[in-house]
From Swiss-Prot:
Endpoints of the signal sequence: none
Entry keyword Signal: no
Organism the protein comes from: Methylobacterium radiotolerans (strain ATCC 27329 / DSM 1819 / JCM 2831 / NBRC 15690 / NCIMB 10815 / 0-1)
Protein name per the record: 3-isopropylmalate dehydratase large subunit
Residues that hold [4Fe-4S] cluster according to the record: 349, 409, 412
The protein's annotated pathway: Amino-acid biosynthesis; L-leucine biosynthesis; L-leucine from 3-methyl-2-oxobutanoate: step 2/4
Family: Belongs to the aconitase/IPM isomerase family. LeuC type 1 subfamily.
Cofactor comment text: Binds 1 [4Fe-4S] cluster per subunit.
CDD domains recorded: IPMI
Role description: Catalyzes the isomerization between 2-isopropylmalate and 3-isopropylmalate, via the formation of 2-isopropylmaleate.
Keyword Iron-sulfur: yes
Catalytic reaction equation(s): (2R,3S)-3-isopropylmalate = (2S)-2-isopropylmalate
Length: 470
């Protein structure tokens, strides 16, 4: 009789090809997602070695990081970005990989197009040369980012050498209050455990509040596992998962789907399985969260005040937080609701899905973007954009004064034309608030889509729980 196993244990065990003398394992990789930034050297390595892509049908490529979100007929001005986009188009053609280019209606952020195409499925091992690959763990998959040399290894062999991580479970019990979302949950978790709290672990998210989330919400949670230091994050698949996956273009059909579902239903943590670390949060006590510093762990309730670093005993941590406040142009004791904003960014692989855009439109209603605030919405994929337009969300948002863009990573990172100017302060639905992340000397506050939408109208942070309806 085998010992009780976690969800992570089960997927790992099902994919071990060989165990090495040093304790590392060779894992079979089910799905490989590729974009333009981390793949050029990998493909060049294949050419130099005279190798082919072992399983092109298990690989899907898309442009997302460098694409402009304005008029795409104008082409790319930045020569490095243009070179990367052209290289990916050439590489996928030469190696026979399916590819969504900038003009394909299925194009979008890699971690949004995988799930919506049914390329992402429960029980799989999924890799991509991108740190937010953990997003796909929302489906009960083992998904994580890899480096460029590993991208080449997976292209050539469909395998990857890995050491098994430790098991960690974060349980969020109870029911979320109105106005509190999946984004607030994950920001609260990172605030609780810190950016190193999950180091060396794969996190399984569990509890009543997690089970109650939609797939979009679960993807938001798993997306930011890396910001909590974890190798990956995952949620056990259930009826919500199966309903989302069914009838997706690349998902199994008919009897094949039924057979797959029977396997997927076994992907739950056994009673009595061991976790190396356990963390519990009470959903009922969670407020809307705003980040105030330059690390995702620098978070506080929207009703809070900027903390005073002088109260921190550890000298290194105190100096780090003092530096963060200086960069952000904030002083201790300032109310979060007194912080005014220059820019609003709604999008990214964290919060660029149709559910997010519906919530933004609901919050905005017939109101207008505050004078002096520049607000942009970047749908996560062409299909998300088309769905939003079919529902009339774009009309609501454009009438309010939002800039309605084409899909891509956009202002989540400063690798394309969408950047903050020095000193600009932005409420962003993305996943990182590092120095310069959204542009040199730009100041980023991480929030939920609802909080960002309300801030766009008010021109400052407001408590979405007090937002008037209609």
């Amino acid at each position: 009789m085998t010992s009780p196993r976690t969800l992570y244990d089960k997927i790992w065990d099902d994919h071990v090809v060989d165990v090495q003398p040093d304790g590392s394992s060779l894992l079979y990789i089910d799905r490989h997602l590729v974009h333009e930034v981390t793949s050029p050297q990998a493909f060049e390595g294949l050419r130099v070695a005279g190798r082919k892509v072992r399983h092109p049908e298990k690989t899907l490529a898309v442009v997302d990081h460098n694409v402009q979100t304005s008029d795409r007929s104008q082409g790319i001005d930045d020569p490095e970005s243009r070179t990367q986009l052209e290289a990916l188009a050439e590489n996928v053609r030469d190696f026979g990989i399916e590819f969504y280019d900038a003009l394909d209606r299925r194009q979008g952020i890699v971690h949004i197009i995988g799930p919506e195409q049914g390329f992402t499925l429960p029980g799989q091992t999924i890799v991509c040369g991108d740190s937010h690959t953990s997003t796909h763990g929302a489906f009960g998959a083992l998904a994580h980012g890899i480096g460029t040399s590993e991208v080449e290894h997976v292209l050539a062999t469909q395998t990857l050498v890995q050491r098994k991580a430790r098991n960690m479970r974060v349980s969020v019990d109870g029911t979320l209050p109105p106005g509190v979302t999946a984004k607030d949950i994950i920001l609260a978790i990172i605030g609780e455990i810190g950016t190193a709290g999950g180091t060396g672990h794969v996190i399984e998210y569990a509890g009543e509040a997690i089970r109650a989330l939609s797939m979009e919400g679960r993807m938001t949670i798993c997306n930011m596992s890396i910001e909590g230091g974890a190798r990956a994050g995952m949620v056990a698949p259930d009826a919500t998962t199966f309903a989302y996956v069914k009838d997706r273009p690349k998902a199994p059909k008919g009897a094949a789907f039924d057979a797959a579902r029977r396997y997927w239903e076994s992907l739950v943590t056994d009673a009595g399985a061991h976790f190396d670390r356990e963390v519990r949060l009470d959903a009922a006590n969670l407020p809307p969260i705003v980040s105030w510093g330059t690390s995702p762990e620098d978070v506080i309730s929207v009703q809070g005040r900027i903390p005073d670093p002088s109260e921190i005993a550890d000298e290194n941590k105190r100096q780090s937080k003092e530096k963060a406040l200086a960069y952000m142009g904030l002083t201790p004791g300032t109310r979060i609701t007194d912080i005014t904003l220059d820019r609003i960014f709604i999008g990214s692989c964290t919060n660029g899905r149709i559910e997010d855009l519906r919530e933004v439109a609901r919050v905005v209603g017939d109101r207008k973007v505050h004078e002096g605030v520049s607000a942009m919405i970047v749908p996560g994929s062409g299909l998300v954009k088309a769905q939003a337009e079919a529902e009339g969300l774009d009309k609501i948002l454009k009438a309010a004064g939002f800039d309605w863009r084409e899909p891509g990573c956009s202002m989540c990172l400063g690798m394309n034309p969408d950047k903050l100017r020095p000193g600009e302060r932005c409420a962003s639905t993305s996943n990182r608030n590092f120095e310069g992340r959204q542009g040199p000397r730009g100041r980023t506050h991480l929030v939920s889509p609802a909080m960002a939408a309300a801030a766009a109208v008010a021109g400052r942070f407001v408590d979405i729980r007090e937002w008037p309806q209609g």
